Amino acid sequence: MDAIADSTFQINKSKVQLVEETPSLLTLVIDTNPKLWAEFDREVGKKGQLMQVLKSTIVFLNAHLSFNNSNQVSVIAACSRGIKYLYPQADDKEGSTKKKKSEDRSIINRNMYRGFRNVDEAVVEELYRVFQQESKQLEDGVPQPFRSTLSGAMSAGLTYINRITHETEGVSLKSRLLVITCGSSASKDEVFQYIPIMNCIFSATKMKCPIDVVKVGGVKESTFLQQATDATNGNYLHVANTDGLIQYLSTAMFIDPSLRQWVVKPNQSSVDFRTSCYLTGKVVAIGFVCSVCLCVLSIIPPGNKCPACDSEFDEKVVAKLSRKPVITGTLRKKKKKKVTK
């Protein structure tokens, strides 16, 4: 009987091996411009929409850290007058806050997991200082700038990702950039942001770092950020309000970059790849492009100089481009002569 053995009845040991997940670095950029959020509060009719976003963001960061013990996070705020690294701090090498906080000012539960508490305390404390500085400037009557610093914060986030990736050469580290911004019915893309955002797109594509975007409020889509997500295999999500924001973050923004080619992403069906003229601000489908800084223009600038990088254009090329189209004359049909009888 022992000789009769069928391979189908033999019990084979499973060769399942546990594969450790690759650590991930999540760099979060939050647009904290008070002017944008104040306009959004008036449209919604509720105050404190920025605080609701920050609460959902902290939960999202804790969820990312809980996936793997080696996961890392970085938080950058795009303020009205620059950018601010919320976490990790400049004087913190290991990513944990060493500043002593009084018990009265501590709003984070001390019984929380240490990894979560270090991040939450640093983010809340630095945001509190940013808000204090913004309110002090308003009380002093300092005029608020109208330009956004979102593109600068994105550049700083990619710089941090590049540095951390080179510091951990022995460990493979996946990285991605998440941008949370706000929009209103009157808000639109600023023309001067096109070139910095295009530079961010080129850098992220070279580093194979996807850019994810969550836009809260607003009627119009952010054309430049849509182009960034499409070029880097990222996700673009437009949320009407802050209700259920943590659900959007924990579903659409937790899709692993390696699985995004098989998963239906919540992106828009069509992306507007047109750009804006640097001088007039009009949407341009066909225009003039500077060969140095890739500045797009709908008209030839005065002085034959690029308004962005101040490069001089070749006079022969400008004369050729300024030449109006010539319509060749059509051949006239010969009139038939009347034959008189």
UniProtKB/Swiss-Prot annotation:
Report the subcellular localization.
Answer: Nucleus
Choose any GO biological process term that the UniProt entry carries and state it.
transcription initiation at RNA polymerase II promoter
Tell me what this protein is called: General transcription and DNA repair factor IIH subunit TFB4
What role does it play?
A: Component of the general transcription and DNA repair factor IIH (TFIIH) core complex, which is involved in general and transcription-coupled nucleotide excision repair (NER) of damaged DNA and, when complexed to TFIIK, in RNA transcription by RNA polymerase II. In NER, TFIIH acts by opening DNA around the lesion to allow the excision of the damaged oligonucleotide and its replacement by a new DNA fragment. In transcription, TFIIH has an essential role in transcription initiation.
**Gene3D superfamilies per the UniProt record, alphabetical:** von Willebrand factor, type A domain
What family name appears in the similarity comment? Belongs to the TFB4 family.
Residue ranges of the C4-type zinc fingers?
Answer: 290-309
Subunit structure as annotated in this protein's UniProt entry: Component of the 7-subunit TFIIH core complex composed of XPB/SSL2, XPD/RAD3, SSL1, TFB1, TFB2, TFB4 and TFB5, which is active in NER. The core complex associates with the 3-subunit CTD-kinase module TFIIK composed of CCL1, KIN28 and TFB3 to form the 10-subunit holoenzyme (holo-TFIIH) active in transcription.
Q: Which NCBIfam families match?
A: tfb4 (TIGR00627)
Pfam families named in the record: Tfb4 (PF03850)
The lineage's top-level taxon is Eukaryota
Name a single GO cellular component.
Answer: nucleotide-excision repair factor 3 complex
UniProt keywords (A-Z) are: DNA damage, DNA repair, Metal-binding, Nucleus, Transcription, Transcription regulation, Zinc, Zinc-finger
Reply yes or no: does the keyword Transcription apply. yes
List, in alphabetical order, the Gene Ontology terms for molecular function in this entry.
Answer: zinc ion binding
What main location does UniProt list? Answer: nucleus
